[in-house]
A protein has these predicted regions:
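N-terminal presequence-like segments and the immediate start of the first folded domain
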Residues: 2-93, 97, 102-142
Length: 142
């Protein structure tokens, strides 16, 4: 019986994923006792890009932006997504699924109007979910 595929691969072949934009949760949530090493995006097996939920936050400084403004938070969120996709070697045109989390249904129109500017002609499957809160109180959309 053959060994597992992993054990037969040469070390350089074992890198199946490209990881983009590392960060640690203690930078995003300094008031919490978290210390997790994560990435904003991962290109898996050179075929699919997985993004961490994006919010209105500067990817470098972790500064939260546009508190209370759903449209501007959405614009920053979409800019982050576009940047991460670019780093992964693709574009918004390749997006086939998007899930949006809102903290209040009243933000839906502003959020979807802004998202529509970024996804015009793309036609992804989209799901919107209203939640009681996101990880930070100033975030209204993710």
């Amino acid at each position: 019986m053959p060994r597992s595929v992993i054990s037969l691969l040469k070390p350089r072949q074992m890198t199946l994923h490209k990881r983009i934009w590392p960060f640690n949760t203690k930078e995003t949530y300094p008031e919490q006792q978290l210390d997790n090493d994560l990435y904003q995006a991962v290109v898996a097996r050179c075929t699919m890009v997985f993004l961490r939920g994006q919010v209105s936050q500067d990817l470098d400084s972790r500064e939260n932006l546009h508190e209370g403004d759903a449209a501007k938070q959405t614009e920053k969120m979409m800019r982050n997504i576009a940047l991460l996709l670019e780093k992964a070697g693709t574009t918004m045109g390749a997006v086939w699924r998007i899930v949006v989390y809102l903290t209040d249904i009243c933000y839906r129109e502003a959020v979807y109007q802004e998202m529509g500017k970024w996804l015009k002609g793309v036609h992804p499957c989209s799901t919107g979910i209203v939640v009681s809160a996101l990880a930070r109180p100033e975030w209204v959309v993710a």
